[in-house]
Amino acid sequence: MKIGVLTFHAAMNVGAQLQALALFKTLKDAGHEVEFIRYEPNYLKYPYRFFRNARIKNGIVSYVKQCLLHIFCDTYTWIKTKRHYGDFQERFYTLSRRVYKNPDELAKAVYDAIITGSDQVWNPEITNGNLDPMYTLHFQSDRIRKISYAASFSEKHIDRNMAEELVGRIKSFYAVSVREECLKKYFDNLSQLHIEVVLDPTLLLTKSQWLALMPEKRMIKERYVLLYQARGIKKDVLKQATDLADKLHATVYDASGMNYRVAKYGKQYVSPIEFLNLVFFAEAVVTVSFHGTALSLVLEKPFFSICLNDGRDGRVINLLKGMGLSSQLKPVGEELAVPRMDYSLARRHLDTARTASLSFLFKALN
């Protein structure tokens, strides 16, 4: 089949890029002709804001200094990151020749199927306050099979009217899946639609498949603990990683990005492939990130996933609970012991979940 995929494939975010790659590779390895549909809404083009961390409470002079620091540091980092991600996309992706601007254009596209997801493609907080009709495949077509794979949204950011509107749109889908159990329950309370819960695409690929994509040579020669925070920089988490590194006679390497204040611990920007390398060769991983957790899991690395208790820990908690690894969840500030992990049980759980998720995907395309 010729398949178009609508996701946040151009987002300059390690998780977004690697999950897009994983879904692309899974479909392509199954013999399908696959490309990412180029859709470039303004709300995704430039996610970084120069003044987002500046504070005026310390006086106008301090505020101006902070703004200037953000302008120069964020701009430099954004340019470097854009280049890294552009190289990654050119190497691994196939993109549609044309840029699509509305659902009517999609209805005329020469695809046998269009898959929307993974990622929070149905989250109005991300899609400019509304359900984006592109990501909900809001068009009429008897020719194109509509499928969602691991699509997501936040219950906190969608009201009942909008949820009912979403249900109305996905009624025309051939197959629907979401990536969180809570979202399936949410839909079950609103409709009679058959909805399945599937793995995030990063977990569809095996350890050997991920390793085949990255260079064998390690980036960092010395022993290190990898720190990756995707929900803002928390000094307490940095301290947890630093203390753990001391126990392991290692240094801390921070791959969080966009954070010049702790640049001495690492780089401000890494490519998605570099990130894989950093995870695989780390003595341990300390992360506040679903994808940091997922990749540590699939690469079978010692790790700790730090919970911020901000209402956004659910995905990680559910994932690790399902894998029998809840012991790797730790609150902010708690001392981290040297991790000693046995992956034998988690490996079996992951294999079972992967088989079910691939079954959903391939059945939807057959």
Question: What are these regions, as identified by a protein language model?
Answer:
Residues 1-366:
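Active-site anion-handling motifs in enzyme catalytic cores
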